[in-house]
A protein has these predicted regions:
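Internal glycine-rich alpha/beta core junctions
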Residues: 93, 100-167
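Conserved, charged catalytic cores of large soluble enzymes
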Residues: 1-109
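Alpha-helix capping and helix-loop boundary segments enriched in small/acidic/polar residues
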Residues: 10-17, 70-74, 84, 129-132, ...
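Single conserved hydrophobic/aromatic residue that forms the stacking wall/gate
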Residues: 172-178
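Residue-level marker of positions within ordered structural domains that often coincide
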Residues: 31, 146, 176
Length: 179
């Protein structure tokens, strides 16, 4: 609905592409025709932080059992087929197998994200400010992890940082080519 012609203009997002990371646990439940449980990252921040690590499965199962955590159960097959249908209709959803990236990476550090097309899988460290320490491993399309945004004001700041970083990168790259 976000990218295709279904729904109304109010619930479509035409200028945004989607990258979905899927875990080994999801695939296991898909194959076994089981349900998957969906959580808000704000409900289970420890689970969100453990994404892509060995601790994720244990924390996930614990959150599923916890009565006080808001959650929604859905068929893993239904969800995956919906994702594949949207991908087939729009060509704009990219799927990353996060556990596979980490088990087959030549890096000791975790792969937490990728560029949109999923071909750049390098370790990254968060950047809080354009002059701060951190590590970016993306093409110049850039990316913002909206799951980490708590307040609307943060989005504007992150967008500014992303644009500045892209401009700085392309400017530095142009200087190197000219030199």
């Amino acid at each position: 609905v976000l990218k295709n012609n279904k729904g109304s203009e109010d619930n479509r997002v035409r200028k945004l592409d989607y990258s979905i990371q899927i875990s080994k646990l999801f695939y296991e439940r898909f194959i076994n025709e089981e349900d998957i449980t969906l959580f808000s990252p704000h409900e289970v921040p420890d689970l969100y932080e453990a994404w892509g690590t060995e601790a994720f499965d244990e924390l996930y199962l614990k959150a599923e059992r916890k009565i006080s955590v808001k959650k929604k159960k859905i068929s893993a097959q239904e969800l995956f087929f919906d994702i594949l249908k949207e991908r087939a209709e729009t060509g704009r959803i990219y799927i990353m197998n996060i556990d596979h990236c980490n088990t087959h990476s030549s890096f000791k550090d975790l792969i937490r994200m990728s560029n949109l097309c999923q071909e750049i899988t390098l370790p990254t460290d968060p950047i809080q400010h354009i002059d701060g320490e951190g590590e970016i491993a993306l093409c110049i399309l850039s990316a913002i992890n909206v799951g980490k945004i708590d307040k609307r004001d943060e989005l504007e700041e992150l967008c500014d940082l992303a644009v500045r970083s892209c401009l700085l990168y392309t400017s530095d790259a142009a200087d190197e080519v000219v030199s």
